[in-house]
């Protein structure tokens, strides 16, 4: 019989792009305990990059992780889209305690040349 896994604290990695929202929760060794994206929750196309999609991704993942005993989170945010505030608000409202919040958005120090601008 399989033993039930149980964790009390973990790390939440919230990755917000302009097209999608991914959240994965790991334990302190880096083993993934649960994940969700706006596509896996059921949104398609342009609806994947809305604040409501980010909120529903966070709430479905937090309810899944509460069942295995998660109570404390370190949150790592990545991405400059304002949608990440909705995901963070949903994590905060789920009842799981956030002890640290880190912004891991990569910022270039004048790296490679940007792509050409799109003309619409």
Curated annotation (Swiss-Prot):
- GO BP field: translation
Identification of the protein by name: Small ribosomal subunit protein uS11
Gene this chain is encoded by: rpsK
Please give the InterPro entries that the UniProt record associates with this protein.
Ribosomal_uS11, Ribosomal_uS11_bac-type, Ribosomal_uS11_CS, Ribosomal_uS11_sf
Q: One GO term of the cellular component aspect?
A: ribosome
SUPFAM superfamilies for the chain: Translational machinery components
Q: Which family does it belong to?
A: Belongs to the universal ribosomal protein uS11 family.
- Give the organism the record lists: Neorickettsia sennetsu (strain ATCC VR-367 / Miyayama) (Ehrlichia sennetsu)
Which keywords does this chain's UniProt record carry?
Answer: Ribonucleoprotein, Ribosomal protein, RNA-binding, rRNA-binding
Q: How does it assemble?
A: Part of the 30S ribosomal subunit. Interacts with proteins S7 and S18. Binds to IF-3.
Task: Show the GO MF annotations.
Answer: rRNA binding; structural constituent of ribosome
Please provide an example of a Pfam family that matches this protein in its UniProt record. Answer: Ribosomal_S11
Q: Which PANTHER family match?
A: 40S RIBOSOMAL PROTEIN S14/30S RIBOSOMAL PROTEIN S11 (PTHR11759)
Q: What does this protein do?
A: Located on the platform of the 30S subunit, it bridges several disparate RNA helices of the 16S rRNA. Forms part of the Shine-Dalgarno cleft in the 70S ribosome.
Entry superkingdom: Bacteria
């Amino acid at each position: 019989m399989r033993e039930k896994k149980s964790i009390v604290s973990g790390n939440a990695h919230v990755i917000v792009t302009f097209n999608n929202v991914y959240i994965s929760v790991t334990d302190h060794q880096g083993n993934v305990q649960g994940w969700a994206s706006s596509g896996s929750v059921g949104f398609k196309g342009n609806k994947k990059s809305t604040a409501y999609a980010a909120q529903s991704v966070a709430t479905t993942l937090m309810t899944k992780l509460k069942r295995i005993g998660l109570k404390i989170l370190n949150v790592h945010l990545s991405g400059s889209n304002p949608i990440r505030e909705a995901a963070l608000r949903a994590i905060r409202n789920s009842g799981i305690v956030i002890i640290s919040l880190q912004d891991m958005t990569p910022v270039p120090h004048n790296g490679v040349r940007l792509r050409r601008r799109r003309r619409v």
